[in-house]
Design a protein with these regions (language model features):
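Extracellular hydrolytic enzyme modules, especially secreted metalloproteases
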Residues: 73-237, 243-248
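Active-site-proximal segments of metallohydrolase catalytic domains
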Residues: 1-108
Length: 251
């Protein structure tokens, strides 16, 4: 975001839930139901701690809420492997407590409704966490093909594609940066002639170039510079990246 998004989490203690993992990781159940059960029981267990009101509630006062008094982001990690079954059982996802209902976090005040869950093992993996926060915090869509029947999608060049590498996930692509208000663009036309500078750092960071398809307000080409440094160290290549954007497409 180049400093336009500041995101700070309050980390609580580990808690042991009242049911075995097999209860929450029921692969015959929709992942949203299992996630709701996990998050609700985790919050109930946390709030039952003797020092909850004196120790954690004062920290939670700093959390940002929306107009409904819902905390804008709640991250829950569960130990061990995920279900391995797409969207079933304990599958990492971002959603809300549609089944359990909003849960009170502070007495008469802030509530938990949006959440994301991610499995955590013995590695400092942040890729899935970052991807799911793209959904929860920023409203970013998935930019990969759900049924893998085409070669479309953003691939490893976007966090919301397949760029959520465990230890060092890729940046968000130019399209989503601009949609989030993190970027500026220069509009190009068929008669444009300019010497453009694209950079992964410095004054031109998050500045892109757009050529609109004639007669369309939702389809265009977007150019950015990507380099194998920082969050992009794992990219297969670097240089000028030109995206073909169709905002009315689906995955």
């Amino acid at each position: 975001s180049n400093g336009k998004l500041t995101y700070t989490n309050i980390v609580t203690v580990y808690v042991t839930l009242p049911q075995p993992k097999t209860f929450y990781n029921d692969v015959t159940q929709d992942g949203g139901i299992c996630g709701n059960n996990l998050v609700k029981d985790a919050l109930d267990t946390l709030k039952a701690m003797p020092d909850y009101n004196s120790t954690l509630v004062p920290l939670f006062d700093a959390l940002t809420v929306d107009n409904n008094n819902y905390v804008i982001a709640c991250n829950v990690f569960f130990a061990g492997a995920n279900s391995g079954v797409w969207a079933m059982g304990l599958w990492p996802h971002s959603s809300a407590l549609y089944y359990a209902g909003a849960q009170e976090l502070t007495p008469g005040g802030k509530k938990i409704f949006p959440y994301q869950i991610t499995d955590i093992g013995n590695r400092l993996a942040i890729g899935t966490f970052a991807h799911e926060n793209g959904h929860m915090l920023c409203g970013f869509p998935d930019l990969y093909d759900y049924d893998y029947d085409s070669v479309g999608g953003a691939g490893v060049f976007c966090l919301m594609g397949s760029g959520g590498g465990d230890l060092n996930p890729s940046q968000v692509c130019a399209y989503l940066k601009y949609a989030a208000g993190w970027a500026t663009i220069t509009e190009l036309t068929s008669s444009s002639s300019l010497l453009a500078t694209v950079s992964s750092r410095g004054t031109n960071f998050n500045h892109f170039y757009r050529f609109q398809k004639p007669g369309s307000s939702t389809e265009y080409f977007l150019a950015e510079g990507r380099y194998k440094t920082g969050r992009d160290a794992g990219l297969p290549g670097c240089g000028l990246l030109i995206w073909h954007i169709d905002e009315l497409g689906d995955n």
